[in-house]
Design a protein with these regions (language model features):
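Conserved ABC transporter NBD signature motif
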Residues: 27, 58-74
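The feature captures the beta-strand-to-loop junction immediately N-terminal to the Walker
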Residues: 36-38
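Helix-to-loop junction immediately C-terminal to a conserved catalytic motif
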Residues: 51
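Catalytic Walker B motif of ABC-type/P-loop ATPase nucleotide-binding domains
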Residues: 151-155, 160
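ABC transporter nucleotide-binding domain
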Residues: 167-256
Length: 300
């Protein structure tokens, strides 16, 4: 299995502020990787380092077999879509398509026109007059027209309503299917339910550090929620890694990374979903920043 992204001890400082610290992650090719964490966790910083838009303070980063760099050969392989949707509001989608053809050697203008026609998005209206969901679709179609091998998406659906998000993610998964295994995606978002629908890999950041990285199904299988009486849990803690614990007067609830079978009959073990896993590693609702990850998702 080839690797699309690999970092070792990657760090980035802005004067006295550490934006990313000791970041070591691996993302195989042909994956949709969820990049998740509260505001200020370092998600945008990591994406910019992967895209070659920023230089690391320390550590190493390897993207598609080489170091990110600002040269045409590397940039042709990378699609980067910023959260603010970088479109010229007075230009039409057709204007953007023609400009892209002059700037990108592998430009696929037909794919943009086809995707936008399928979505009933007009080519000859100024993009500033389109809805937020339509602008996001135009930006994604233009980014995909580069035919990148790595697509970096920085919270592209943050301002969209649930239906527009669903359409956007549908376009993304269709592009993956059409790529023939030649596309890897890193999708940054606060919306855990959306990520759970389309992603098969995860990078979880908190406080500028990597908390979790790996295949989602594998990680879910390695974790359980254990619920039982409030008592000494030292035996459980020796057998398993306790990620998060909630104790009441009568009951203990543990999120654990399994170190083997659960032998204690007093505890009931249940599977975890992605939201439980993410919030467990981030300390559940311990800080206001974590509430973003549930409150926004409840809009669906």
């Amino acid at each position: 299995m080839n690797t699309a992204i690999e970092t070792q001890g990657l760090s980035k400082r802005y004067r006295r502020v550490t934006a990313l610290s000791d970041c070591s992650v691996t993302v195989p090719e042909n994956r949709i990787c969820a990049l998740i964490g509260p505001n200020g966790a370092g998600k945008t910083t990591l994406l910019r380092l992967l895209a070659g838009l920023s230089r690391p303070t320390g550590g190493t980063v390897c993207v598609l077999g080489g170091a990110p760099r600002q040269d045409p050969a590397f940039l042709a392989e990378i699609g980067y879509l910023a959260q603010e949707i970088p479109l010229y509001r007075r230009l039409t989608a057709e204007d953007h398509i023609r400009a892209g053809a002059h700037l990108n050697p592998r430009w696929d203008a037909l794919s943009v026109r086809t995707r936008l026609a399928d979505l009933n998005i007009p080519l000859n209206r100024a993009v500033g007059t389109l809805s937020g969901g339509q602008r996001a679709q135009v930006a994604l179609a233009l980014t995909l027209a580069k035919r990148p091998r790595l697509l970096l998406l920085d919270e592209p659906v943050a301002a969209l309503d649930p239906l527009a998000r669903r359409h956007f993610l549908g376009t993304l998964t269709a592009a993956m299917a059409d790529s023939g295994g030649e596309l890897t995606v890193v999708l940054s978002s606060h919306l855990i339910a959306d990520l759970e629908r389309v992603c098969d890999h995860i990078i979880l950041l908190a406080e500028s550090r990597v908390q979790l990285c790996g295949d989602i199904d594998t990680l879910l299988g390695e974790h359980k929620v254990l619920v039982g009486p409030r008592k000494n849990t030292s035996a459980l803690e020796r057998a398993h890694t306790v990620v998060h614990a909630v104790r009441t007067a009568r009951q203990t609830t543990l999120l654990v990374r399994l170190g083997g079978p659960v032998f204690d009959p007093a505890y009931e073990a249940s599977d975890v979903d992605l939201e439980e896993l993410v919030l467990g590693y981030m300390g559940a609702s311990a800080t206001p920043a974590l509430a973003q990850l549930t409150a926004i998702g409840e809009e669906q």
